[in-house]
């Protein structure tokens, strides 16, 4: 899959989760932060990244950089996705179902952030496994990566699109 050049896209960033971690040293605790970020153009391109630093703004900046490096193309069918899909990452499991126009994005926290920035307007989702933000984000990205348009499936099977849909 060709890499997506994020610099050519009008992207929007969203903070999904900021975590403070402590390293215990002889003189006390050393705090650092990790920021889970999602970047998207609202038109089928989305990416997620994790940034770690001693300060929150720096962690966010690094997270955005990482997210832009890991962007994927999401095949959209109008305002929804082409078919139902389950994405898994670690113990995180996310079910994505296409929905009729006007339904809206029915999703919780981390999954909602990704879908909105990807440009999906109508979708039903359900978190089936761990609710850890990092695993949910990565599971959603895996699910979106595995989506295929009817044209792609027809080409892979060597059949006309009408035969698949009809």
Swiss-Prot record:
SUPFAM superfamilies tied to this protein: dsRNA-binding domain-like (SSF54768), Ribosomal protein S5 domain 2-like (SSF54211)
Annotated keywords: Ribonucleoprotein, Ribosomal protein, RNA-binding, rRNA-binding
Pfam families documented for this protein: Ribosomal_S5, Ribosomal_S5_C
Domain S5 DRBM: 11-74
Ribosomal protein as UniProt keyword: yes
Disulfide bonds listed in the record: none
GO molecular function terms listed in the Swiss-Prot or TrEMBL record: rRNA binding; structural constituent of ribosome
Entry superkingdom: Bacteria
GO terms for biological process, alphabetical: translation
Protein task: With S4 and S12 plays an important role in translational accuracy.
PANTHER family, sorted: MITOCHONDRIAL RIBOSOMAL PROTEIN S5
Subunit structure, as described in the record: Part of the 30S ribosomal subunit. Contacts proteins S4 and S8.
Protein's name in the database: Small ribosomal subunit protein uS5
Taxonomic classification: Bacteria, Bacillati, Bacillota, Clostridia, Eubacteriales
């Amino acid at each position: 899959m060709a890499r997506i050049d994020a610099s050519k896209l009008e992207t929007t960033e969203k903070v999904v989760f900021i975590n403070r971690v402590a390293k215990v040293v002889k003189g006390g605790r050393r705090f650092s932060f990790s920021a889970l970020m999602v970047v998207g153009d609202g038109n089928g391109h989305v990416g997620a990244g994790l940034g770690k630093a001693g300060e929150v703004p720096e962690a966010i900046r690094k997270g955005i950089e990482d997210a832009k490096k890991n962007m994927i193309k999401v095949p959209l069918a109008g305002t929804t996705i082409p078919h139902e899909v389950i994405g898994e990452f670690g113990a995180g499991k996310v079910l994505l179902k296409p929905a009729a126009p006007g339904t809206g994005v029915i999703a919780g926290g981390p999954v909602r952030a990704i879908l909105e920035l990807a440009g999906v307007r109508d979708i039903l989702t359900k978190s089936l496994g761990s609710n850890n933000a990092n695993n949910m984000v990565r599971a959603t990205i895996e699910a979106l990566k595995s989506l295929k348009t009817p044209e792609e499936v027809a080409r892979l099977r060597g059949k006309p699109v009408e035969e698949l849909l009809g």
